[in-house]
Swiss-Prot record:
Protein name: Chromosome stability protein 9
Domain of life of the source: Eukaryota
Protein's organism: Saccharomyces cerevisiae (strain ATCC 204508 / S288c)
Molecular function via GO: chromatin binding; SUMO transferase activity
TM region(s), chain numbering: none
Subcellular location(s) per record: Nucleus; Chromosome
Length: 482
């Protein structure tokens, strides 16, 4: 029995030895289970077992004389148990307590367990030990597997930590490299900004060229002379009076002089005496004035603003044709309607000149045609003559002298000269009773005077529109044409 107890309660730490001991224990338990019903007979009382006897005389229990148990764990019979002294005869311990081992008496559980038979205790112990061993083995297997997983996980984490450590160690080097590159980049930007300012401006100027400018530096004297000459030439070439004299070639058509308004004696006097108005130009034969228009007549065509015209309409003659009353129009063509307007105009002087200076002078051919025409003149509209549209001078705010302003200045100078010629021609009409020699002398003198005024005006610097307006206010004779 002692061998069984030693096998069961030996602690086993090694797994292999534990398995071997377990197998041996199982074999012994099987052996005991086979022997107990045949050879090992269970006693009727628990106190009749072989290990229960007196420690001094080795006597077993009986019904009349039961055994006794001391507090020091010794069994004594009635003879050897102390009655008065409380000293154990086996161990000599003092002050002991004694209890009778009787079946009828209920013993405490902690005392009764000492007298339980061993096979049931071993079986229960085996079951308990088997249960505990299985639980412990499973727990060990679980922790073993978990430990393996944790080892693998730790190995992976170790690799990650190693890589992170390498990256952290390289971050300091990379930060230094970034700072170096940023410093180089900033230096390059500053240098490019300081050096690249001029090229960008030059490129901007190359892409966007400045706008073209107009050259205003012109020789005034040469330009005025050229424009004055060209204007006079154009006026001579495009003059309706000159063209009409060339086209007619001395032919005379019947006119309507008999039906002209009677309130215009000066105009009728001019129509009746056309040869009075001719002033020979310098260097030409006075006898040739019948074929060419007079300079005074050409000059008077630009000075028609002195009269307040009442527009008229020229009716057709007996032959079904309009009277050949030609005057300059806007485009230089011939218009008979405009000369009819001029012929029927009421001549009202607007300047301090004499009334005789306001007479309209026409070429001989046109005067004859108007004198012999018998068609009446009736007023229809109030439109300004289209022949004077070219001679309008527009007012501009800009005082800079352009090409158009220079032309208007030359026109104003020509108007001034034409005013003198007009006054001279009117004086010649008033003094028609004088001898022809005096008329020729006076016409020559007036022609020279107009030439001198033309030259002086050509040499003068170009005038602005404000200057012309100021001069017109001072002298109504040089009024601008609007």
């Amino acid at each position: 029995m002692g061998g069984y107890l030693a096998i069961v309660f030996i602690p086993q730490t090694n797994t292999k030895s534990m398995r071997e001991k377990k197998q041996k224990c199982l074999k012994q338990v099987r052996r005991l289970s086979l022997i107990s019903p045949k050879k090992y007979i269970m006693p009727d009382s628990i106190f009749e077992q072989p290990f229960v006897y007196c420690g001094v005389c080795h006597r077993r229990t009986s019904h009349g004389d039961p055994l006794r148990l001391t507090s020091c764990a010794h069994i004594l019979c009635s003879q050897h148990s102390p009655l008065t002294s409380k000293v154990c005869p086996i161990c000599r311990s003092s002050d002991i307590s004694i209890i009778n081992l009787v079946e009828s008496k209920q013993l405490p559980t902690d005392i009764r367990i000492f007298f339980e038979p061993l096979p049931p205790l071993l079986e229960s112990l085996y079951n308990v030990s088997q249960f505990q061993l299985n639980g412990l083995s499973k727990q060990c297997q679980y922790y073993q597997n978990h430990c393996l997983k944790l080892r693998e996980k730790c190995a992976r984490q170790q690799q990650l930590l190693y890589q992170a450590k390498i990256e952290l160690d390289s971050m300091a080097i990379l930060k230094k490299r970034i700072q170096e590159l940023e410093s180089v980049l900033n230096h390059n930007n500053v240098s490019s900004m300081s050096v690249g300012v001029l090229p960008t401006r030059n490129s901007h100027q190359n892409h966007y060229q400045p706008p073209p400018t107009v050259d205003l530096t012109v020789d005034d004297n040469s330009l005025e002379e050229f424009e004055a000459k060209s204007f006079i030439k154009k006026l001579k070439k495009n003059s309706s009076l000159r063209n009409s004299s060339k086209n007619n070639n001395g032919t005379v058509t019947p006119s309507t002089s008999g039906r002209v308004n009677k309130n215009q004696p000066l105009f009728m006097e001019t129509l009746n005496n056309p040869n009075r108005n001719s002033i020979p130009p310098p260097g030409m034969n006075p006898n040739a004035n019948s074929n060419l228009p007079n300079i005074s007549t050409i000059a008077e065509s630009t000075n028609l603003n002195r009269f307040s015209f009442s527009p008229v309409r020229v009716a057709k003659g007996f032959d079904g044709k309009l009277p050949n009353l030609d005057i300059l129009t806007n485009n230089g063509s011939v218009s008979s309607k405009n000369i009819s307007r001029l012929s029927s105009a009421s001549l009202q002087p607007s300047s301090p000149l004499s009334s005789s200076s306001n007479r309209l002078i026409l070429p001989n051919s046109n005067l004859k045609e108007l004198h012999h025409s018998n068609t009446p003149l009736t007023s229809t509209s109030t439109q300004f003559p289209s022949a004077l549209e070219k001679l309008k001078i527009t007012r501009k705010r800009n005082n800079t002298i352009s090409g158009s302003n220079r032309i208007t200045h030359n026109l104003s100078s020509h108007v001034r000269s034409s005013g003198l010629a007009f006054s001279s021609s009117s004086n010649s009409l008033q003094q028609s009773k004088l001898p022809k020699s005096n008329i020729l002398k006076r016409s020559n003198s007036t022609q020279q005077l107009t030439n001198t005024h033309l030259k002086s005006d050509n040499h003068l610097p170009p005038r602005s529109s404000n200057t012309v307006l100021g001069s017109s206010k001072k002298n109504n004779k040089f009024r601008r044409i609007r």
